[in-house]
Amino acid sequence: MKIKTRFAPSPTGYLHVGGARTALYSWLFARHHGGEFVLRIEDTDLERSTPEAIEAIMDGMNWLNLEWDEGPYFQTKRFDRYNAVIDEMLEAGTAYKCYCSKERLEQLREEQMAKGEKPRYDGRCRHSYEHHADDEPCVVRFANPQDGSVIFDDQIRGPIEFSNQELDDLIIRRTDGSPTYNFCVVVDDWDMEITHVIRGEDHINNTPRQINILKALNAPVPMYAHVSMINGDDGKKLSKRHGAVSVMQYRDDGYLPEALLNYLVRLGWSSGDQEIFTREEMIKLFSLGAVSKSASAFNTDKLLWLNHHYINTLEPEYVATHLQWHIEQENIDTRNGPQLAELVKLLGERCKTLKEMAQSCRYFYEDFSEFDADAAKKHLRPVARQPLEVVRDKLSAITDWSAENVHHAIQATADELEVGMGKVGMPLRVAVTGAGQSPALDVTVHAIGKTRSIERINKALGFIAERESQQ
């Protein structure tokens, strides 16, 4: 049997991390078994579905590199198919027209709740032989079995059973002629030959209804696996107050897709004590049997740790392709300065996100108008004038501009003046970067460049002279 899974989001908002994890698990299961992965957009909610949400879902899937083999299919383009199946069910007697008014249904609901009963349709029109005009408004309901039970072997949770007496006759077509979500899903899974439905636990109650419709259609019933929800680190359902919940917001915040995927796969699944997984390892090791039944807690600190790991272990050239977007957001012109791959090497240890990296690299490419006030007050004092003058001259004398030779120039200055390296290094750091923190000074000065470094030292000396004149 060829394994075939699907990810079927509703385009009523962004792709959130819970949906992304479901997509990842479905994708991994298909890839592990050499099967196929289908993307389906469940846009039957015409009022809430938007083109912007569809684009956001596609952007998120593409950024995570969860490529699909079929689709995207859109349910709104398949209404003719759904209605044809409903008409066949009406002919076969597995569905019927219901003419009950909203007022009657509301009264029925209130009476049942007053008795402490679960609200459900009482089947009045199922057994009615009243004549109705062809144009009289009605819905179509599925004639759910009235006895027995539905049992399915959830691939994560084990056997789950529902009594058919708990299930009412589901509306499968509205009065406006549009098919409903639960029915469209069934026909789609049937037509697309889906073998395994992997989705959130909030769909468990839909499953027996969908299985009954499939059986009424003499269609194969797929295997089901329901993934537990994701909570915040406080144990409550994950929401915006816990931080970002949109996949693309994590992109905007400077995370690499590899970090988010690695984090999401471990959010409910494990393989021994292993924490770091390549995509190839995920595909090789993934199984539904190792997915936890319990809710997972989202831990941003752990995700940040993973992101820092990947910034420093992936190829710098690859990381640079993702850094480029953040550089553009900061409006930094990188034509006059180090290559971005070199920047990744320089700042990788110091920066946990690409956004942080982009926001802290401007001095490599652009001159600054003023020094950081605290750093200048502490390190650009009259006592720093001589070390800066000497190191400037030694840097000017370098013919082979390299980090090693820059280091020798700084060391030689300290030796000549018989002072510690900090007496030279800290004023030099503030002079060339404008601030008191940077990567190793020799590689920083080398990356900034000879001409620009000397110009900035002269600017710092001018700052010191002005400071002296005001004393």
Curated annotation (Swiss-Prot):
Manner of cofactor binding, per the entry note: Binds 1 zinc ion per subunit.
UniProt keyword annotation of Protease present: no
Motif position, 'KMSKS' region: 237-241
Coiled-coil boundaries: none
CDD domains registered for this protein in UniProt: GluRS_core
One GO CC term, this protein: cytosol
Assigned keywords, A-Z: Aminoacyl-tRNA synthetase, ATP-binding, Cytoplasm, Ligase, Metal-binding, Nucleotide-binding, Protein biosynthesis, Zinc
Reactions this protein catalyses: tRNA(Glu) + L-glutamate + ATP = L-glutamyl-tRNA(Glu) + AMP + diphosphate
Domain of life: Bacteria
InterPro entries with a match to the protein in the record: aa-tRNA-synth_I_cd-bd, aa-tRNA-synth_I_codon-bd_sub2, aa-tRNA-synth_I_CS, aa_tRNA-synth_I_cd-bd_sf, Glu-tRNA-ligase_bac/mito, Glu/Gln-tRNA-synth, Glu/Gln-tRNA-synth_Ib_cat-dom, GluQ/Sye
Entry keyword annotation includes ATP-binding: yes
Residues given in the record as Zn(2+) binding sites: 98, 100, 125, 127
Pfam families, alphabetized: Anticodon_2, tRNA-synt_1c
GO biological process, one term: glutamyl-tRNA aminoacylation
Cofactors required: Zn(2+)
EC number annotated for this UniProt entry: 6.1.1.17
Top-level EC class as recorded in UniProt: ligase
Single Gene Ontology MF annotation: tRNA binding
Residues holding ATP: 240
Function: Catalyzes the attachment of glutamate to tRNA(Glu) in a two-step reaction: glutamate is first activated by ATP to form Glu-AMP and then transferred to the acceptor end of tRNA(Glu).
Record note on quaternary structure: Monomer.
Family label: Belongs to the class-I aminoacyl-tRNA synthetase family. Glutamate--tRNA ligase type 1 subfamily.
Protein name: Glutamate--tRNA ligase
